[in-house]
Amino acid sequence: MSNPGALPLRTAIKRLYKIVNAMYSDSILILEGTKELAADVVDRDKEADKLQWFIERQFNMMLEDSSLSRQLQATSFEGVIYSNVARYLERIADHACRLAEIGYVAGLIPGRKMLPLAKDAEYIMKEAMKSFINNEPRKA
């Protein structure tokens, strides 16, 4: 994207979250035995990596040129937060990819032990992001 304001940071974070959430949900399905989704999870990990890189690039551009804050609809302080959230979401995407690989290669045997933990982690991620998006930091 040549226009820095074409995708504001908040919108980019929401898009990244949708990708990561779908990846994580699919990785749980893979642990439950739906192996066909494994390649899709890996493909979406590449999308998540690119979007996280894009958010970092936007943030760095904003630090170099403070007038971009208005176009990106975020202050420098908010930019730091969005950058950190993007990094965390990308890391969750990496974990979803790993879960998908484990489920695909090993099948249900290890998945039985991992499944409740994976579902708990999914719930925590969803609640934290809901609080972040709704600007309720105490709940996040």
What are these regions (language model features)?
Residues 1-140:
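Cytosolic, long alpha-helical scaffolding segments
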